[in-house]
From Swiss-Prot:
It is found in: Cell membrane. It catalyses: K(+)(out) + ATP + H2O = K(+)(in) + ADP + phosphate + H(+). GO terms for cellular component: plasma membrane; potassium ion-transporting ATPase complex; potassium:proton antiporter complex. CDD domains: P-type_ATPase_K (cd02078). Keywords: ATP-binding, Cell membrane, Ion transport, Magnesium, Membrane, Metal-binding, Nucleotide-binding, Phosphoprotein, Potassium, Potassium transport, Translocase, Transmembrane, Transmembrane helix, Transport. The chain crosses the membrane at residues 55-75, 86-106, 236-256, 269-289, 615-635, 643-663, 688-708. InterPro entries: ATPase_P-typ_cyto_dom_N (IPR023299), ATPase_P-typ_P_site (IPR018303), ATPase_P-typ_TM_dom_sf (IPR023298), ATPase_P-typ_transduc_dom_A_sf (IPR008250), HAD-like_sf (IPR036412), HAD_sf (IPR023214), P-type_ATPase_bsu_IA (IPR006391), P_typ_ATPase (IPR001757). Part of the high-affinity ATP-driven potassium transport (or Kdp) system, which catalyzes the hydrolysis of ATP coupled with the electrogenic transport of potassium into the cytoplasm. This subunit is responsible for energy coupling to the transport system and for the release of the potassium ions to the cytoplasm. It is a multi-pass membrane protein. It comes from Mycobacterium tuberculosis (strain ATCC 25618 / H37Rv). It is an enzyme of class 7 (translocase). The active site is at residue 324. This is Potassium-transporting ATPase ATP-binding subunit.
């Protein structure tokens, strides 16, 4: 009743208060971000910034050289030559600036999110509890690790912490953007609270778990702003490839001049620099950083924060998904629907024992048992706090049981309720022998996709015995089978993790369409499965929210922790889902794959379009010496100068044209790697060959029409 009353009041409170902030989707060219990116493009011309990108550093050096050559020859050259030299130098500068603009646009989206988050991180007064039990009001900036604070309805939680006392409805819209309030309470996996969120009802006592400057919001700001961004292994490898190609083309251009001089047609520095810049992979070199930053930003748009680009890349390479059954594959509101007694025991007796054993069970299933016993048999829920003769045994993932030890006149009566295998073992360990009838009931419920919880008791004067079974029902989510079919087409193996017995797990696994399942799983089993998969050369992704999930989250290549989870879980994972939706793991993998596909597609396009620029510049450079080279002028460009200038201008403009694709990402489809490769080679490989021929010709026509050439 208390929970129902609190949820009602929370809903009413939420109705009157709109969310203050959400990690909202922004348009691709948000005017505010564009205005911020323009000056950043100029600041990024600093050599120390350009040094991180070897390709663009070469372009920058080329722009400086051509500018100096233009200024040197300004007085001695003809007007036409000066226009040519000036335009080449200008568009080399534009090439660098466009690359800087792409990176600044990607960074700007994160900085806009960070600016909004800083509004949440405001100084508040906290009611700190002293060692003597008194309350003192202190600024939130003075709170230390393990301080204890009291937060009442209407007050802002001053810092990250764990609830150690009480239950409350909390408005987390400042973090998640979700206006509906959530329940936070002491104990279990819903005890973590975040600084900057607001208590809507009741009162809680919170133990501070974060040092100043290391709160969840501080880490969010650092992540979305890119302060913690480092190059990923794939980016480093691609940079090495691009640097190698740049060196090869640099050597080719340097050695070309002696041959040209020997042939009697030495080339000017401006022409040689133009050739070099057009041949090196400037397109992907200009967009590489933006692609990586935009990939992390797409996660932010889905309310997922990654600790690094490495985590996003790993998501794209994942080939095993570990998915918890409850809440991910099924709706997660598994409810008790029936008490099934064995012969000689009444259903009411089973309900009474099941309810007693569930009083300390804070899981949704445990609470549903208490409610069902009350509804079916009028058994009033007893408050564990006033049962002085009882010692409650809480549910844990390790024991997979909960229960109570009652001090009665005849002795100690011990009641246990939980997973069939765990309770059966408990019965055998205490002298009992589970009957075939219990096994038949368990198998019948399991084969129908339900979850059986066995109820057993043991008194001092007799052996332990099973007295009945609680039938829990859950529903597989609509459309989840189709999502798993998509994963299978991408050669991703799906494994369902559940605490259910093998029969129940098998029935649900078949209905959902997963490739495999792990039944009666403990945290140790989950960790062992991850290690086995990794030893086989597979990358593993999983979700978790509890402290017992922390080792597995840390071991997994992609560990997505729920924002509603414990502090330990959030620190162990390399991603945090602000919506606490386990199903989102599938979307995380798709975003990771989209990042890798985008990078590969634009790399293919960048290298392929060098062919057209080769056909434009090489004939133009030497057609005077070797007229036969005019046959290579397949685009029928107007003159050698217009050919070189057209290639340089196109080389700069194509970067601008591809910025939306770099930020938005290549369209993702669930298909096999070979099909994906064929499609991208056709679109971006063939496109990289054809588009430059058309683009350079169009630029040439414009140059001629303007009388520049």
């Amino acid at each position: 009743m208390m929970i129902a009353r609190m949820e009602t009041s929370a809903t009413a409170a939420a109705a009157t208060s709109a969310p203050r902030l959400r990690l909202a989707k922004r348009s691709l060219f948000d005017p505010m971000i564009v205005r911020s990116a323009l000056p950043q493009s100029l600041r990024k011309l600093a050599p120390r910034v350009q040094a991180r990108n070897p390709v663009m550093l070469v372009v920058l050096v080329g722009a400086v050289i051509t500018t100096l050559a233009f200024l040197r020859d300004l007085a001695s050259s003809t007007a036409q030559e000066n226009v040519f030299n000036g335009l080449v130098a200008a568009f080399l500068w534009f090439t660098v600036l466009f690359a800087n603009f792409a990176e600044a646009m990607a960074e700007g989206r994160g900085k806009a999110q960070a600016a909004a988050l800083r509004k949440v991180r405001s100084e508040t007064m906290a009611n700190r509890r002293t060692a003597a039990g008194n309350i003192e009001s202190v600024p939130s900036s003075r709170l230390d690790l393990d301080d204890v604070v009291e937060v009442s309805a209407g007050e802002t939680i001053p810092s990250d912490g764990e609830i150690i006392e009480g239950i409350a409805s909390v408005d987390e819209s400042a973090i998640t953007g979700e206006s509906a309030p959530v329940i936070r309470e002491s104990g279990g996996d819903r005890s973590a609270v975040t600084g900057g969120t607001v208590v809507l009802s009741d009162r809680i006592v919170v133990r501070i778990t974060a040092k100043q400057g290391q709160t969840f919001i501080d880490r969010m700001i650092a992540l979305v702003e890119g302060a913690a961004r480092q190059q990923t292994p794939n980016e480093i490898a691609l940079n090495i490839l691009l640097a190698g190609l740049t060196i090869i083309f640099l050597l080719a251009v340097v050695t070309l001049q002696p041959f040209a001089i020997y042939s009697g047609g030495g080339q000017r520095v401006v022409v040689l620099v133009a050739l070099l810049v057009c041949l090196i992979p400037t397109t992907i070199g200009a967009l590489l950083s933006a692609i990586g930053i935009a990939g992390m930003d797409r996660l932010v748009q889905h309310n997922v924060l990654a600790t690094s680009g490495r985590a996003v890349e790993a998501a794209g390479d994942v080939n095993t998904l570990l998915l918890d059954k409850t809440g991910t594959i099924t709706l997660g509101n598994r409810q008790a629907t029936e008490f099934v007694p064995i012969n000689g025991v009444s259903a009411e007796a089973v309900a009474d024992a099941a309810q007693l054993s569930s009083l300390a069970d804070e899981t949704p299933e445990g609470r549903s048992i208490v409610v069902l016993a009350k509804d079916e048999f009028g058994l009033r829920a007893r408050d564990e706090g006033v049962m002085s003769h009882a010692r409650f045994v809480p549910f844990t993932a390790e024991t997979r049981m909960s229960g109570v030890d009652l001090a009665e006149v005849s002795g100690i009566r011990r009641i246990r309720k939980g997973a069939a295998a765990a309770v059966m073992k408990w019965v055998r360990d205490h002298g009992g022998h589970p009957t075939e009838e219990v096994g038949a009931i368990v198998d019948g419920i399991s084969s129908g996709g339900g979850t059986p919880l066995v109820v057993a008791e043991w008194t001092d004067n007799s052996s332990a015995r099973a007295i009945g079974v609680v039938h829990l029902k859950d529903i597989v989510k609509v459309g989840i089978r189709e999502r798993f079919d998509e994963m299978r087409r991408m050669s991703i193996r799906t494994v369902m993790i559940t605490g259910d017995n093998p029969a129940t797990a098998k029935a649900i696994a078949q209905e959902a369409g997963v490739d495999d399942f792990l039944a009666e799983a403990t945290p140790e089993d989950k960790l062992a499965l991850i290690k086995r998969e990794q030893q086989g050369g597979r990358l593993v992704a999983m979700t978790g929210d509890g402290t017992n999930d922390a080792p597995a989250l840390a071991q997994a290549d992609v560990g997505v922790a729920m924002n509603t989870g414990t502090q330990a879980a959030r620190e162990a994972g390399n991603m945090v889902d602000l919506d606490s939706d386990p199903t989102k793991l599938i979307e995380v993998v798709e975003i990771g794959k989209q990042l890798l596909i985008t990078r590969g597609a634009l790399t293919t396009f960048s290298i392929a379009n060098d062919v057209a620029k080769y056909f434009a510049i090489i004939p133009a450079m030497f057609v005077g010496l070797y007229p036969v080279l005019d046959k290579l002028n397949v685009m029928a460009l107007h003159s050698p100068r217009s050919a070189i200038l057209s290639a340089v201008i196109f080389n700069a403009l194509v970067i601008v044209a591809l910025i939306p694709l770099a930020l938005r990402g290549v369209r993702f489809r669930a298909e096999s790697a070979s099909a994906m490769l064929r499609r991208n080679l056709l679109i971006y490989g063939l496109g990289g060959l054809v588009v430059p021929f058309i683009g350079i010709k169009l630029v040439d026509l414009v140059i001629v029409a303007l009388g520049v050439s």
